[in-house]
Amino acid sequence: MGQESSGRDALTRRDYLTYGGAVVAGEFLAGCASQAESGATPESTATDTATATATTESATSRTATADSYSVTMAPVGEVTFDSPPETWVANNGSWADMGMALGLEPPKAVWLTNRYHTRYYDGIDGVSVDTSEMVSLYQDGVSRELFYELDGDVHVIDPNFLVNRFQGWERSDVDEIAENVAPFFGNCIYAQHYPWHDDYRYYTLYEGFEKLAQVFQRTERYEAFEDLHDEFLSKLAPVVPGQGERPSVAVLWGVGDTPEKFYPYIVGGGTGFKHLRDLGVRDALAATEIEDFHGSRAAIDLETLLEVDPEVLMLRGYESKAREEFEDTVVDFLRNHGTASALTAVENDDVYRAGGLYQGPITNLVLTERAAGQLYDFDGELFDRERVAEIVDGAF
């Protein structure tokens, strides 16, 4: 981490708030006083490389003052807000996309901006986001100073992610930022394979989405998306063939545009696999001795992949490329490689982009529909794009 700046002693706008004890029994009061205002590995870290709408939801309890409210989410617990946050920082594109769905301004920062794939919005008229001022939290390390500079009203990040995934952070660093800047409120919902996830309480995409909607007091948008999602799943069901008719699929993170090494993924829980679970994907790696990358941090080579020989390759790490560019670079390399060209998926032109690690309610709709076409030759629309734009805009 960088050295502490001399400006650390200067008052932030939260110093003007009445905390009523600041931090009591793990509960943080989040004040919002201001009225203005493809890497080498899947995860590049130093260790592993509107208007608020009042609600009466049972999960949201009114405490502290007449206008304050509390929202509870594991592992952080209960967090009290005296008003809806106006600015925020998100861990990843899952949360950023949820914010988009709620009609929020984009987060000031995400872990890596190049992993928030806004290209998915291009096919939905009326839905777009300006990320020109968004910054990456990870910049050859994660500096506490950056959290002070960003000065968000809430950090939608599981603090355990910072402590366990980046060597430079301790619990005391998290406590400092929570007390002096803003609370943490988040869950590592995108994957469920980390060794530090023993006894971890996971949330589904829509459970996490509901919690975020409660934080920002925009539950009507959440409910509208939930209805849209139910309709989407009902349309998707007849698209998915019977188990015996589904091709075997291997999900891998390819290293570079000429991949001879791959990081394997077992299709499991987490938002990063929701589209594949909903499509009932038959996982070619699940029955092998190949371990999931999240737990092993190990790669496999083309020879090992050829032994498995899946019918379809779904490759991660290429979402910044359009389909044509992906095919002209990565797929073309595999077609002309001595070993890769023998893969059934390569021979049959069944090599596709797998979708990003981080999915929210909008991006999940887009990626699931795309994968339905890739895997099951579906040609059509599974969700109402105009309705998505209406919900984002607050038109119910």
Feature locations, PLM:
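Internal helical hairpin/lid segments
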Residues: 293-301, 308-320
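Extracytoplasmic ligand-binding site segments that recognize negatively charged/polar headgroups
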Residues: 114-120, 162-170, 185-209, 244-274
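A short, structured surface patch at a secondary-structure boundary
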Residues: 86-171, 175-176, 180-183, 284-287, ...
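Bacterial Sec-exported substrate-binding components of ABC uptake systems
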Residues: 2-97, 219-256, 316-317, 378-396
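Solvent-exposed, polar/charged alpha-helical surfaces in well-ordered, non-transmembrane soluble domains
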Residues: 96-100, 145-149, 172-175, 179, ...
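Second-shell loop/turn segments in exported
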Residues: 85, 161-164, 194-199, 211-220, ...
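Structured C-terminal subdomain patch of bacterial secreted/periplasmic proteins
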Residues: 199-203, 315-396
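Alpha-helical, coiled-coil/dimerization segments enriched in small aliphatic residues
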Residues: 262-296
